[in-house]
């Protein structure tokens, strides 16, 4: 694709790449919050594959002036504000939809992997960013490199960290429901803390997240979950 873009056009086609904070691997405590200059040492195939593509894009920019914007997501979450679109993985692996699914079910439970991390409550801390805010960042990043033909790299997060227990407690508050918690062993390779430093994106792209806190993100995810379950119920009623 990259070769074709430079062959067929007088100007290479701008590329906005969805990368990940997983390229940073296990940052040191003094590297939190994570800036774009934090060393990249991915510890899993997902992070390594994203870093490989980043390096290829950077090489193409240097060799062919390919306009590139690399966006390193932190934990994408939430649903469309209207409730029409949201996370629906099979199998589900993301924390917020797993918690909401457990809350929706009678006698549901959520497994917490690790309660002995060096954090204030012993569980992992993550930086959650709303999917709509990520989409807006893509548009802003594309417009920038169309105009200046540059190479740009940005961390996309809210710059706030929430523990697994805080996610569960916030989801309980939003839904008004209770949930059973099962404590389990750590998962290998889970960093204790991942929090972004998003100031570069805010300064250069004029990016301003509309969902800056966990509760607002979970409310949109819960609206989506209710919409999805109602859709399933209607299909069963109609024999679909």
Mark where each language-model region is.
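Catalytic helix-loop patch of NAD(P)-dependent Rossmann-fold dehydrogenases
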Residues: 11-14, 23-70, 75, 82-94
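Structural signature of the Rossmann-like NAD(P)-dependent dehydrogenase/reductase core
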Residues: 14-19, 69-72, 127, 155-156
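Hydrophobic positions on the long internal alpha-helix
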Residues: 1-2, 57, 137, 141
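C-terminal substrate-binding subdomain of Rossmann-fold SDR/epimerase-dehydratase oxidoreductases
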Residues: 98-240
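A short helix->loop->beta-strand "cap" motif at the edges of active sites that frequently abuts
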Residues: 2-14
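Alpha-helical segments that scaffold the active site and NAD(P)H-binding pocket
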Residues: 3-4, 58-62, 100-104
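Active-site proximal helix/loop that lines the substrate pocket
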Residues: 20-26, 78-81, 117, 161
